[in-house]
Amino acid sequence: MKILIGLDASTHSERVLDFVARMRWPAGSRVIVLSMLQPVASAVTGAYEPTVIPAENLEGLRAQLEELVADAERALREVGFSTEGRVLAGDPRETLLQVAHSERADLIVVGSHGRSGIAKMMLGSVSSHVVTHAPCSVLVVKQTGRAKEGGKEPRP
């Protein structure tokens, strides 16, 4: 089974990774850990704006995401997965779908950040877009109330 995991720099990504690591998967399952450098979105319209990000900030963000992906790969290898990590530039919604298509993923795993109402409408939802347009099944890992409050979550 080929599993594509979308991670970002949020604490909820830890929940996604932990969920995948604890589940039972077919022998020989391979995980692609993907994180995206994304364009800056306007908080008012949700539209992507051509904002120039200073090179040193972009390099710092890329380094942070590469470390996140490397840590995720290590954690997954410890529990027996074959892994590959990537940091790509682009809109997370479209990048996840493109990689799922090109890699012929069997499953995409993403987190739900719990946005609702106006925030969801303005900012959009990566998980909703991926669920709607994915070429394969999608598992959305919800952040529970205990995790939002900083408590320990039950085992999936």
Label the predicted regions.
Residues 22, 74-108, 145-156:
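Structural beta-alpha unit
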Residues 32-34, 84-88, 139:
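General small-molecule cofactor/ligand-binding pocket signal
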